[in-house]
Amino acid sequence: MRIRPGRFAVLAVALLTASAALPATAANSQERHHSPSHPSSGGLSAVIRYTEYGIPHILAKNYADLGFGTGWAQAADQVCTLADGFVTVRGERSRFFGPDAEPDGSLSSAAENLPSDLYFRGVRATGTVEKLLAEPAPRGPSRDSKDLMRGWAAGYNAWLAQNRITDPACRGASWVRPVTAVDVAARTFALAVLGGQGRAVDGITAARPPATTAARTAVGIPDAQSAARAAQKLFDTADMGSNAVAFSGATTADGRGLLLGNPHYPWQGGRRFWQSQQTIPGELNVAGGALLGSTTVSIGHNARVAWSHTVATGVTLNLHQLTLDPADPTTYLVDGKPERMTRRTVTVEARGGPPVTRTQWWTRYGPVVTSLGAGLPLPWTSTTAYALNDPNAENLRAPDTALGFGRARGTADVLTTLRHTQGLPWINTIAADSGGHSLFTQSQVLPRITDELAQRCSTALGKALYPSSGIAVLDGSRGDCALGSDPDAVQPGIFGPANMPVLKDAPYAENSNDSAWLANTDRPLTGYERVFGPIGSPLSTRARGAKADVSAMAAKGELTVRDLQAQQFANRATSGDLIADDTARDCAVLPGGTATGSDGKAVDVSEACGVLKAWDHSMKTGSRGALLFDRFWRRLTAVTAPAQLWKVPFSAADPVHTPNTLNTEAPGVATALADAVSELRAAGIALDATLGAHQVVVRGDRRIPVPGGTESLGVWNKVEPVWDATAGGYTEVTTGSSYIQAVGWDGGRCPVARTLLTYSQSSNPNSPHFSDQTRLFSEGKWVTSRFCEKDIASSPGLRVIRVGEHR
C-alpha cells in the first residue's frame, strides 16, 4: 500500500532536489563526505540526516538509492562487525582467523571457524542464494527487495572507498573488502536458516559415511530419554528472546493502540540492532531497528502502525530417518527404491596450513546430519542416517515482509503482508495501530508437520522427541511420510497462513517467547499443531510476570505511552515476589543465624535475612538486596528441580500464578543462601550493595550501571550479565534488552514514539555514539522519536550529508 503524497512528500522531495537549503554541520572525523550543495556526480545517492544519538534519517528517490544510503550509514557505524559477517557468509573465517578459532555465533551455531566455512562455502558453491534471488515473487524476493540489496552493497562499498576506518577492531585489516548484492542476500539467508541448518552446521559438516566395522554396526538410534532432554535443551538455550505487547483502543486513554517492543538480542556481534528511518517520498516512511546487514527495518513503526517481534516456539526443522542400502551407506531407500546421496565437496583455505577439503552429503530431504547440538548425536551407521529438513533454506522473503509492514496503514495490512509473503522464519509478530487495533500472530515458516503425520510416520526416536520438543523424526523410507502442502502456502512443504495462530483486537496481545497459547490469558489460543509450540505447559518466570503485568495494565485502562515506559523500567523480579519473603522469614529462624554451605562450612547468614526482607523485589540500579537475591536464586535453581522447589505445582487452569510457594524445607535452600553470602563476601561486595554498583558494562574508562535481570529472575527488562568476582561483579552483558520502542498516537500527524538502543549505534570505541544510549538505558531515559519532517528539521544537532557512489 502506497503513501499518499502530501506536505511531507513535498518537503522530502525538496530535500532531494534542493538539498543546499538544508543546514549541515561538520562531518564526523572519519567521514569525508559531500556537502548537501554538492551532490555526487552520478550513480546511486541518498541524503542522510543525523539527529541526536547518531540516528540517521535516510532519504532517497527509489529503493536502490535507499539501499545505498542504508548501506553507507550502517558501514559508518558498524563496518568491522559487518565485515566480519561477510567473511562468515563467504566461508573465509579459517583463511583470515584460523580454522580452530570460534566465530561469534551470530550467523550460525558453528563451534569453530572450519565447520562454519565448510557450510557457507557449500552454500556458495551450489549457487543456493543466486537461485533464490532468481525465483519470481512472491516465492522469491521482489524487485524492490533486490534493488535494496544492490543499493546496500553499493553504499557499503562507497563508504569503504571514500572513508578511513578508525575502529581498532578492523583498522587496516585485509578481510575488510567490498561486497556484492549476493553477499548481502547471503547474510539474509544465514539469518533465515539460523534455527534450522544454521543450528546444525557442525553436524552437517562432520557427517561422513561409516568406514570402520564398529561404526557400521553401531546402533543408530540414541537413547530416547536423553535425546528428548537434549532436544528440549537445544531450543531452551537459544540466545535470543523478547517481550512485546500491543494494547487495543479499549484499554487506552484515547481509543488508539499502543505497542511496547522489547527484543532481547546479543549486545555484541552480528545480531545487534541498528536504528534508522527510511524514506522514499510518497512510497515508504518507516523508522525502527534493523539487524545489522539488513536492508530494511525489522522492528519499528510508521505513521499509523507499530510492530515488534518475539522469537517463536515453532520448531523450524525436522529430521527424516533414512533406511540405507546395506551395501552402500550413501544410498537410501524410499518405497524400496534406491536413491544416491548427492556429494557436495568444498575446499576451505586455512591460515597456517594447507587447504581443507571435505564432502557433505545431501538427500531429497536436505543434508545428512550427525548431531543437533552437542547433546543430541545422530550416528550414521550402515543401516541408518538422518537428514535435516529446513524450509527456510528456500526463504529469502523477509525483506519483502518488512517492506510490507513499512507500507502498512494498520494491523490488517500487517496480517495481509504476512499471508502474502510468508517471510518470517522464527519469530512472532505483535502490532498495534492508530485505529485502536491489536494483533498477535505466529506467522512463521514451519515444516508442515501435522500431529497426524507425526503420529503416523514418527520413528522410535521421533516418538520420544516430538511430544516434548516438537522435533519430528519421520520415516524417510516411506513416500507417504513426505511433508504435504497447504494450498495457500507460498512454498511447498510448509503450513499456509490459514493454519497460523492469530489473535485480533484483544484488549492486549503479549508474548514473552512462550507459545501462542496465552497471548491473552482471557482468550487462549488452541487447536494448532504441536510443531507451533505447546499448549497447557508451564510458562517461564519472565512470561508469568509479563502476563500478570500487562493484564493488570489492561484492566486499569486509560493507558498512554508513559505507562509503556514505566513497564519497561519497572524491573520487577517475579521470582522475588514468589520467594523472597519466605526466604527471609525462614532465614531469620535458622539456629544461630547460620547455614551450611556446599563446602560443609557454617556461614553466618543473619545479615542476609534483613537484607532480603528489606529488598524491594526489583532489579533497579539503586536496589539493595537485588544482587544477593540474584546470586542466591542462581545457585538454588541450579541444584533444585522444579518439582522440589515449589509446594504448589503448576496448573494449566492457573498458569500465571503456578507453581508457587517456596518449599523452604528443600535441602538446597539454606545451602544456596550460605554459598551466595560467602561468594559476595569473598569478592568484597556488601550484602546490601546497590545493584548498579556491581552490575555494569565497561565502556572506555567508564563503568555504566545496568538495570534489569535474568530470564530466571523473571524480569521484563531482561539482561544476561557476565559474572567476574575479581572485577567486582557483573561486568558485561551478553544478551538482553536491545532496540526498545514505546509507540502510540494522539490524533496528530506524527506518532508518539519513544525509543532506546541499549548498546548504542556504534561498536567503534572512537565514535561519539559508542555508549551514549547505554548511559540513557542506565538512567531509565528514552530518545524522543523524530519521525516527522518538522521534528527532524528542529533537531538541535542536525547534521545533513549527501552521499553518492562518486566523489
State each model region's role.
Residues L59-A83, W274, T363-L378, T384:
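Short, surface-exposed, low-complexity cationic segments
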Residues P56, A60, D65-S116, S308-P355, ...:
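Gly/Pro-rich active-site capping loops and adjacent beta-alpha segments
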Residues N520-S598, T690, H694-R807:
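Terminal end segments
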Residues M1-S29:
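Secretory targeting and sorting signals
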Residues H34-L258, P263-G269, I280-E283, A287-A290, ...:
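Substrate-recognition/specificity elements adjacent to catalytic centers across diverse enzyme folds
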